[in-house]
């Protein structure tokens, strides 16, 4: 247990500390020289720290504006979104977290050795999504085995979804050999992919392509990321009831984020490149040409201007949905600052088409409101159990746009707290059918298309 205490201490330090350590170990395992391994690990660590600083700056600018917008719009709902950090704290504070972490690591390694996944995740921090599912199952059933199985099942789903989403990462974000095994980044794809397929077949509609290049072409300097950040920031400021000076200040902050994020992403890729190249050489030799994918935090995707633009435009859209959706009690708040993570893969799916990304994200987020409302009592009780009760506003319940608010994690949770003899075979049967369809029908076509 002493070893796990050390591990948990590193985890508590956050991904900025964890990532360079994991990257260094990863580089050494792939026989990169110690000097190059240290250089790559520190470069990746510095880039990730830079990304986090800019994202935190974005969140601190957007958070007060969002709160003011809620007040200005007169929205009154009794379930508040406390953000992914609160839900992550519940997951990492579970009494059975050592067993769940081992199960997630073991599942990843077993699937790799059995050639059932190509994703090798170094993004240990985002285990918290699976840990949260397992924790909620444990609190509901008081059964350690079932809870650990729920976490492992969530991990299996994530690793396979990361495999299937990897062409989007390599093609749109130009990050070959990388994927994103984070369920909050992948979650909207099961809803967005079939709807996007339908959109491709609607005459006229399928010709609308409103992307960053279109903005630059038709709007000149006003289509540049800096100006888009300024305009969107000022617009959000006015919707929040800010005076012109405050609104302009918010606009400057959004413009700064739009400019700095791509630079940090470029530095991240620069640090990762030697490891990716060495990993490719080793895996080509040891695994007979298998392409092992490095699973990273979705922060590496946030350097794309279309992602930030889509995320900023989704803020008032989600607040509007909170008001008009019948039966909803969830008020989006803290996780609005994390929207870039949640929209990034949809933006890649549409190849940067902001118009289509907004429609797909709007549709995909609708279930979140109902699931967040339904699971709020459970999330509130779990937060109180692990000692987070003081953070809950008086007279309110808490939820988030992560945890069991996401459709797949909600389904896994319900399966493992239900009649296991019925629910688990149904879940696995459906999943393996999807697995077969994706591996035999979809992915070969994607690989053929990408090779042309």
Predicted regions mapped to residue ranges:
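Membrane helical hairpin/interfacial module
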Residues: 40, 47-98
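Membrane-interface interhelical connector segments
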Residues: 63-81, 276-297
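Hydrophobic alpha-helical transmembrane segments in multi-pass integral membrane proteins
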Residues: 56-63, 139-142, 297-299, 371-386
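A short glycine-/small-residue-rich loop at the edge of a beta-strand within enzyme catalytic domains
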Residues: 60, 84, 259, 263, ...
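Hydrophobic alpha-helical bundle architecture
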Residues: 113-117, 295-381
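Hydrophobic transmembrane alpha-helix bundles
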Residues: 57-61, 75-76, 94-95, 161-163, ...
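Signature of multi-pass transmembrane helix bundles
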Residues: 1-54, 95-293, 305, 347-356, ...
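A broadly tuned preference for mixed-charge, low-complexity surface segments
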Residues: 75-83, 100-101, 283-291, 306-314, ...
């Amino acid at each position: 247990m002493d070893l796990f205490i050390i591990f948990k201490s590193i985890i508590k330090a956050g991904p900025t500390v964890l990532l360079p350590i994991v990257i260094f170990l990863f580089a050494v395992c792939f026989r990169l020289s110690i000097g190059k391994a240290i250089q790559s690990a520190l470069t990746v660590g510095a880039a990730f720290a830079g990304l986090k600083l800019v994202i935190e700056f974005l969140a601190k600018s957007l958070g007060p504006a969002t709160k003011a917008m809620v007040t200005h719009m007169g929205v009154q709902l009794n379930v508040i979104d406390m953000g992914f950090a609160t839900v992550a704290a519940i997951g990492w504070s579970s009494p059975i977290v050592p067993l769940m972490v081992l199960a997630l690591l073991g599942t990843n390694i077993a699937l790799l050795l059995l050639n059932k996944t190509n994703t090798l995740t170094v993004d240990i921090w985002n285990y918290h999504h699976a840990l949260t599912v397992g924790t909620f199952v444990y609190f509901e059933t008081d059964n350690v085995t079932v809870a650990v199985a729920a976490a492992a099942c969530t991990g299996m789903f994530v690793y396979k979804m990361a495999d299937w989403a990897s062409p989007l990462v390599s093609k749109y974000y130009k990050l070959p050999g990388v994927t994103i095994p984070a369920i909050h980044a992948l979650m909207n794809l099961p809803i967005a992919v079939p709807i996007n397929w339908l959109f491709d077949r609607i005459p006229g509609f399928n010709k609308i392509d409103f992307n960053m290049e279109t903005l630059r072409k038709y709007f000149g300097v006003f289509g540049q990321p800096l100006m888009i950040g300024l305009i969107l920031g000022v617009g959000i400021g006015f919707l929040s009831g800010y005076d012109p000076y405050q609104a302009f200040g918010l606009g400057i902050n959004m413009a700064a984020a739009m400019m700095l994020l791509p630079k940090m992403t470029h530095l991240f890729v620069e640090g990762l490149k030697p490891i990716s190249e060495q990993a490719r050489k080793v895996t080509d030799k040891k695994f007979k040409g298998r392409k092992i994918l490095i699973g990273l935090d979705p922060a590496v995707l946030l350097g794309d201007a279309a992602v930030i633009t889509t995320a900023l435009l989704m803020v008032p859209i989600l607040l509007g949905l909170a008001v008009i959706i019948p039966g909803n009690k969830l008020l989006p708040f803290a996780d609005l600052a994390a929207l870039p993570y949640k929209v990034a893969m949809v933006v890649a799916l549409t190849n940067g088409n902001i118009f289509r990304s907004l429609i797909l994200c709007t549709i995909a987020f609708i279930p979140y409101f109902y699931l967040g409302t339904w699971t709020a009592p459970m999330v509130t009780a779990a937060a109180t159990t692990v000692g987070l009760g003081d953070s809950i506003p008086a007279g309110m319940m808490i939820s988030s746009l992560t945890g069991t608010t996401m459709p797949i994690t909600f389904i896994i949770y319900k399966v493992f707290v239900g009649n296991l003899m019925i629910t688990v075979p149904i879940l696995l049967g459906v999943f393996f059918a999807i697995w077969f369809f994706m591996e035999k029908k979809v992915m070969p076509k994607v690989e053929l298309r990408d090779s042309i």
